[in-house]
Swiss-Prot record:
Heterotetramer of two alpha chains and two beta chains. The modification Phosphothreonine is found at residues 8, 108, 134, 137. This is Hemoglobin subunit alpha. The modification N6-succinyllysine is found at residues 7, 11, 16, 40. Residues 1-141 form the Globin domain. Involved in oxygen transport from the lung to the various peripheral tissues.
Length: 141
């Protein structure tokens, strides 16, 4: 459960991401594909090379979903319901992959905003991404 301090940390951190959200989303995906090659199996139709337009487009989708989650932090299940349905019923993404992408997002944010990535912010973002992952896997039944 996100505390009021966690919510403030997440919102403040995401505001600093600003217009770079899509870029960071793509970078995190690229980092995930390189670090955890098995994740590529969900994207057989993508050009996964560095700078790929498809990876950039999907990175923007990831970032947009996270922006929605930040904006609706008190009601993520409703805000992310359609995305949860998509991942559970159509895409059938193994839930462990959300943890892998979350880790890569944290690394990406830490690389771009090292001064702002304090232990408290790190912990808050980690809890937030875990909450998003829980929502996205909630319909896996």
């Amino acid at each position: 459960v996100l505390s009021p301090a966690d919510k403030t940390n997440v919102k403040t951190a995401w505001e600093k991401v600003g217009g770079h959200a899509g870029e960071y989303g793509a970078e995190a995906l690229e980092r995930m594909f390189l670090s955890f090659p098995t994740t590529k199996t969900y994207f057989p139709h993508f050009d996964l090379s560095h700078g790929s337009a498809q990876v950039k487009a999907h990175g923007k989708k990831v970032a947009d979903a996270l922006t929605t989650a930040v904006s609706h932090v008190d009601d993520m299940p409703s805000a992310l319901s359609a995305l949860s349905d998509l991942h559970a019923h159509k895409l059938r993404v193994d839930p462990v992959n959300f943890k892998l992408l979350s880790h890569c997002l944290l690394v990406t944010l830490a690389c771009h905003h090292p001064a702002d990535f304090t232990p408290a912010v790190h912990a808050s973002l980690d809890k937030f991404l875990a909450s998003v992952s829980t929502v996205l896997t909630s319909k896996y039944r």
